[in-house]
Amino acid sequence: MQDIVNGRCGWCGTDELYVKYHDQEWGNLVTDDKTLFEFLVLESAQAGLSWITILRKREGYRKAFCDFDAERVAQMTDEDVERLMHFEGIVKNRLTIKSTITNARQFLAIQKEFGSFYDYTLSFFPDRKPIVNTFCSLSEIPASSPESDAMSKDMKKRGFKFFGTTICYAHLQASGFINDHLKDCICRKK
């Protein structure tokens, strides 16, 4: 894989949806808890799959999981799990569907304890500030960091599912707590 393709981080290639996601979302700091929950749901669903697979099903996940309303998702039942096992537009994996409901409940508990999931996330960062890396090559980008290690460990202790350090790191990248746009990427020049 090339490091830079058409001025962008090479991982997004030339797929229109991937390029739009790269340019408009990935690496941009998200302070809104609803959007942070959306990324948490999508990143958890990605376990073992490619990100583009989940990105293409994003609207299906939006419909299936109540427009990413954590309170409504937290109230879902076993009947909802069965319904979602037949829902078009999402990956039909019982464990990840159930984990989304479990994670919604834990997400709400964190909001109650910390005031917001955003503040909870910042608590794992030095000086409570996002990290902007200056990598030149895709091969330099790690799969995890001390921040994702600590956050995923804490989340696991709290009962979150499908959110190990690699998925946590991807979540932190997607939501801009860790900006890994390559040094020569056009998104660095914004």
What are these language model-derived features?
Residues M1-K190:
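HhH-family (HhH-GPD) DNA N-glycosylase catalytic core used in base-excision repair
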